[in-house]
């Protein structure tokens, strides 16, 4: 419903309330450990595709290596899908079975 305002000259102006924009849903991109993909390759993709500094990339790679899975980053759906596709293409070219998945972030109540 629009608010109505009348000025001194009798002109009526209607102002529509601003629509609240919803934040897009975010997704975690998960890296899964395997016995064949090298640690160096995982660090490379974390650095080049996910734009992490070397220390952060190494920390995440070690977490994935030790725990089986780890979060590479949190993105909107389209960005997450694009990053997964890019990494999987790079892995295939190097004949690595590196697997990535994505899952929705928990929404704030």
Question: Model-predicted segments: where are they?
Answer:
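Terminal domain-initiation and capping elements
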Residues: 1-109
């Amino acid at each position: 419903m629009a608010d109505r305002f009348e000025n001194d000259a009798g002109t009526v102006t209607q102002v529509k309330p601003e629509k609240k924009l919803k934040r897009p849903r975010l997704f975690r991109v998960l890296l899964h450990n395997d016995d064949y993909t090298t640690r160096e390759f995982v660090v490379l993709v974390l650095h080049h595709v996910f734009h992490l500094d070397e220390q952060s990339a190494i920390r995440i790679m070690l977490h994935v290596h030790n725990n089986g899975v780890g979060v590479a980053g949190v993105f909107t759906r389209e960005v997450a899908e694009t990053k997964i596709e890019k990494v999987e293409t790079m892995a295939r070219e190097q004949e690595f079975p590196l697997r990535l998945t994505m899952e929705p972030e928990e929404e704030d109540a």
